[in-house]
Amino acid sequence: MNTTEQTSSLPSAGGENGVKLLLKYFPDLTEEQRKQFAALYELYIDWNSKINVISRKDIENLYEHHVLHSLGIARIIRFRAGSSVMDLGTGGGFPGIPLAILFPDTKFHLVDSIGKKVRVATEVANAIGLKNVTFRHARAEEEKQTFDFVVSRAVMPLADLIKIIRKNISPKQQNALPNGLICLKGGELEHEAMPFKHKTSMHNLNEDFDEEFFQTKKVVYVTI
């Protein structure tokens, strides 16, 4: 199935329901974005049956626990056109793929050390016609390019992550928010963030999203 067929085909019930959830919080999605988000359901169901990138117990929560969670980053920043973002430890494409759909004029570079996960993310992005994403199978330490922001979802402790990605943050500023690291994390984070408290801010996603899943979820931003 080519990209045009994939994005224009009728969405599954799972995809339709997922898009309804997203529209609750992002009502301005274009028709193309809605089609792309809807297509994710069948694609991840199919790929997850071959390569486990999402817990099989959690795949039915794809839109709430993975897609909407990824879009939580958009609650603290709207990336300007031409911005560049690296998703470190992307796994099956989170948060990079949902963000790339939401911000089609921003360039996203998705990196993971596990090749089969990179394959899934690449195939999903190709199937929905994303043109603003690139992929690399590599360890974080091997990536030398610079970006406006690095995003990540609970990959490792903040101190370790900051040490690794400091080299990847561009000194050139083009967004309202200074360049840095944006992480999706959960639970008690004050101790973890303490060494960087003067450069760190936390946004509670339960202020934006009603679902119980988000009660302890945060977006952590660190200026680099």
From Swiss-Prot:
Assigned EC number: 2.1.1.-
UniProt similarity note: Belongs to the methyltransferase superfamily. RNA methyltransferase RsmG family.
Keyword S-adenosyl-L-methionine among UniProt keywords: yes
Location within or outside the cell: Cytoplasm
The species this protein was found in: Bacteroides fragilis (strain YCH46)
A single Gene Ontology CC term: cytosol
Binding annotation for S-adenosyl-L-methionine: 89, 94, 140-141, 153
The protein's name in its UniProt record: Ribosomal RNA small subunit methyltransferase G
Pfam families: GidB
One function term, GO molecular function aspect: rRNA (guanine-N7-)-methyltransferase activity
UniProt-listed InterPro entries: rRNA_ssu_MeTfrase_G (IPR003682), SAM-dependent_MTases_sf (IPR029063)
